[in-house]
């Protein structure tokens, strides 16, 4: 049976009693985002909206994004990526569990020097997919060209964020490319493997 969104007690400053609010809302108050599911349009809209709100509240204070995701929609992930670069706060990214596909892309997109992985995290890169291509021959050709364009652009961004040569990125993502936390650090996807949250907050 689904348990729904967990709720936690929270007392507003100056109030004598606590009130129960959703765990997500409590994390947002601490400027913490958690991507803990496949990335789709609904999740992206929520994450984008919260980032815009936190930017308006304090454009100088870091936003921390925890990632435990198998990946998901390219367009949804790119909406999050563009917003990360659109707003002023630094984005601290932390992999817990796994960051695969678009999850790994967003992990690497955090602010340089503030990208972390917990010790037993797994990171996986591969080439993007825009879904099954069907329809008339002309439609298939258009979709195939778009897939190649998106693939090229994502590889270029990964080359920028990791410091790896574009040619190496293109070779590595042709098949599922798995890395441990320490391997992801050596590759340039994260800057450091950490044990405690305070290590990320002190970056």
From Swiss-Prot:
| EC number(s) reported in the record | 3.4.21.92
Q: Which GO terms describe its biological process?
A: protein quality control for misfolded or incompletely synthesized proteins
Cross-referenced Pfam families:
CLP_protease (PF00574)
Which family is it part of? Belongs to the peptidase S14 family.
Q: What class of enzyme is it?
A: hydrolase
The record's subcellular locations are:
Cytoplasm
**Chemical reaction(s) catalysed:** Hydrolysis of proteins to small peptides in the presence of ATP and magnesium. alpha-casein is the usual test substrate. In the absence of ATP, only oligopeptides shorter than five residues are hydrolyzed (such as succinyl-Leu-Tyr-|-NHMec, and Leu-Tyr-Leu-|-Tyr-Trp, in which cleavage of the -Tyr-|-Leu- and -Tyr-|-Trp bonds also occurs)
Function text: Cleaves peptides in various proteins in a process that requires ATP hydrolysis. Has a chymotrypsin-like activity. Plays a major role in the degradation of misfolded proteins.
Give the annotated active site. 101 (nucleophile), 126
Q: Does the keyword Cytoplasm apply?
A: yes
How this chain assembles, per its entry, is: Fourteen ClpP subunits assemble into 2 heptameric rings which stack back to back to give a disk-like structure with a central cavity, resembling the structure of eukaryotic proteasomes.
InterPro entries registered for this protein in UniProt: ClpP (IPR001907), ClpP/crotonase-like_dom_sf (IPR029045), ClpP/TepA (IPR023562), ClpP_His_AS (IPR033135), ClpP_Ser_AS (IPR018215)
**Keyword Hydrolase included in the entry's annotation:** yes
Which Cys-Cys disulfides exist here? none
Kindly list the GO CC terms recorded for this protein: cytoplasm; endopeptidase Clp complex
CDD domains named in the record: S14_ClpP_2 (cd07017)
Q: Which SUPFAM superfamilies match?
A: ClpP/crotonase (SSF52096)
Q: Which domain of life is it from?
A: Bacteria
The protein in question is named ATP-dependent Clp protease proteolytic subunit 1
């Amino acid at each position: 049976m689904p348990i729904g969104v967990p709720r936690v007690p929270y007392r507003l400053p100056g109030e004598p009693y606590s009130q129960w609010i959703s765990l997500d809302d409590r994390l947002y108050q601490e400027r913490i985002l958690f991507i803990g599911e496949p990335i789709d349009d609904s999740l992206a809209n929520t994450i984008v909206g919260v980032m815009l709100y936190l930017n308006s509240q304090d454009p100088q204070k870091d936003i921390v994004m925890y990632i435990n995701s198998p990946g998901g929609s390219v367009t949804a992930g790119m909406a999050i990526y563009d917003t990360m670069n659109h707003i002023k706060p630094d984005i601290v990214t932390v992999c817990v569990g796994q960051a695969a596909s678009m999850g790994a892309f967003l992990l690497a997109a955090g602010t340089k020097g503030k990208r972390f992985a917990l010790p037993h995290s797994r990171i996986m890169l591969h080439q993007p997919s825009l879904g099954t291509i069907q329809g008339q021959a002309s439609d298939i050709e258009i979709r195939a060209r778009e897939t190649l364009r998106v693939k090229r652009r994502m590889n270029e961004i990964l080359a920028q964020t990791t410091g790896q040569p574009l040619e190496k990125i293109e070779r590595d993502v042709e098949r599922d490319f798995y890395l441990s936390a320490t391997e992801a650090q050596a590759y340039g996807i994260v800057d450091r493997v950490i044990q405690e949250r305070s290590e990320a907050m002190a970056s």
